[in-house]
Amino acid sequence: SKWEIGREEFYKQCYEFCMTNASNAREQEKNIGLSADYSREFFTLDPRLTKTVYETFEMMFKQGLVYRDKRIVNVCPNCKTALADIDTQHEERRGIFAYIKYPVVGSKDKYIMVATTRPETMLGDSAVAVNPKDERYLEFIGKKVLLPIQNKEIPVIADESVDMEMGTGAVKVTPAHSPIDFELGKKHNLEIVNVINEEGKMTGDIPKKYKGLDTISCSKQLCEDLDKLGLLEEIQNIKHEVAVCERCLTPVEPIISNQWYLNVNQLAKKALDSLKSGETKVIPKGQQRALEFFYENIQPWCISRQLWWGQRIPVWYSGGKKVYDWLNENEGKTVKDFETEF
């Protein structure tokens, strides 16, 4: 594996492979009818391109368009890297819908039933949320339930975003492992509890028997344990859409992590204003609202990766260097000479 041979040797082998097979790639492109001006050919990691990338990064950094932030992001446990939303795709996979009882604290024989496709994440639950208009749960709002297995009291909160028709109308809230729950957690100031790491293994402050298990194994074990406790109502076998890595098709894990982001919201505003003013026209016109919705709901774009091959982010975390120092001090060098971690 690349971890066994190390970064430098891995880069060397990738570089040699690219150089050896470049001519084959050109011939294949010509064979399929590609017409290109090969006098303008550039290798991805050509020093000239690297310089342009870093100059652009510097410019955007100074403008506040790129920044480092700790927020929830897609992580591929197999590739071991963060991914942007566009780097994932959705596939139909077999799964389960587990109906779990959360006992109401101080109320004998009363509980709130929660339906979830990911029982393993319940170990990191911070609340149970219900719709304030849902008469079934009005008496429980503001009270607490006992989080099964963890034996921890968590609040019952009210939020209008909860779909009363979905599942049981009550949802578990796991801010550390769901983008929707992350935003809900910020809104209600909920605790963030990480229970899954970047390798897709169970971790954190959880019972020892679950630590180190992959998420699927943990889900099965939890359901067995909940059943023994009389807290598992039923399990339905379902088919549902799962976000997977576009490279290896491994299901991604939403995990809170420090990454670098592009503030596309600021850029999207200009495009949105252009649409609404009529400066930009959409054909067919009926699709304009869909494009406006996309711009209105766009999220920060994660641009950092934990991969060893590609342009590297020109940022130091020690030594006092600034982002732009590399450009002046290392002009003409290849990217493999640039030593930084991100």
Each model region followed by its residue ranges:
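Cytochrome P450 catalytic domain signature, combining two hallmark sequence patches
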Residues: 136-138, 143, 191-194, 282, ...
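Residue patterns forming the tRNA-binding/recognition surfaces of aminoacyl-tRNA synthetases
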Residues: 1-111, 166, 170-326
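Protease-associated
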Residues: 108-173, 177-183
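Intrinsic disorder/low-structure terminal segments
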Residues: 41-42, 136-139, 209, 260, ...
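Short secondary-structure junctions
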Residues: 141-144, 231-237, 340
